[in-house]
């Protein structure tokens, strides 16, 4: 399958490349920690458990197997809402993975109100890719500035943008 072939999003699922990239950027933290935005996080960047309970900094550590379970549950919920938001829209597998990763990182509500989604619905794929670069702020800090302490967020956005553009040019 070509990296540029587009399919209805309803028929796609997160690829192995999605999970590899997720682990690359989120890593494994078996103990709760505060993420760049100050939110309690555990495992592979999870802020909530399967039942919707928020991670607390005082939660007990988990093992790697449990980290994967929690992340898969989070991704599964995100995917359902993601596919629904893209009814009738065709995307390449790479785009599906990129935007799902965005949702995992920034949340469903940010996705639903984003210019990425409106551009995709309008068939403006390159504009949707470019919209990724607008998302460079965390806790009012510009993450494209290395000294702001959130540069990894920007690096991840640039990676998403590059992958997305690769599927569209």
Where are these regions (language model features)?
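Mid-length scaffold segments of soluble, non-membrane domains
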Residues: 60-115
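Long, amphipathic alpha-helical surface segments
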Residues: 1-11, 17-38, 46-48, 65-73, ...
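Generic structural motif recognizing short loop/turn segments at the entrances and edges of beta-strands
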Residues: 29, 36-40, 53, 58, ...
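Small-residue-enriched, tightly packed secondary-structure blocks
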Residues: 38-40, 44, 96, 100
């Amino acid at each position: 399958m070509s990296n540029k072939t587009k399919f209805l999003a309803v028929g796609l699922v997160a690829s192995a490349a999605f999970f590899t990239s997720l682990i690359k950027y989120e890593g494994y933290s078996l103990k709760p920690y505060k993420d760049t935005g100050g939110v309690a996080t555990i495992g592979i960047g999870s802020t909530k458990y399967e039942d919707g309970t928020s991670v607390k900094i005082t939660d007990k550590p988990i093992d790697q197997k449990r980290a994967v379970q929690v992340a898969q549950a989070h991704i599964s919920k995100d995917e359902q809402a993601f596919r629904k938001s893209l009814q009738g829209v065709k995307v390449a597998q790479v785009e599906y993975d990129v935007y799902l990763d965005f949702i995992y990182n920034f949340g469903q509500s940010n996705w639903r109100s984003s210019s990425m989604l409106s551009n995709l619905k309008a068939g403006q794929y390159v504009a949707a890719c470019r919209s990724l670069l607008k998302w460079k702020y965390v806790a009012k800090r510009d993450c494209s500035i290395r000294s702001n302490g959130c540069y990894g967020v920007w690096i991840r956005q640039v990676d998403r943008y590059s992958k997305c553009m690769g599927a569209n040019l």
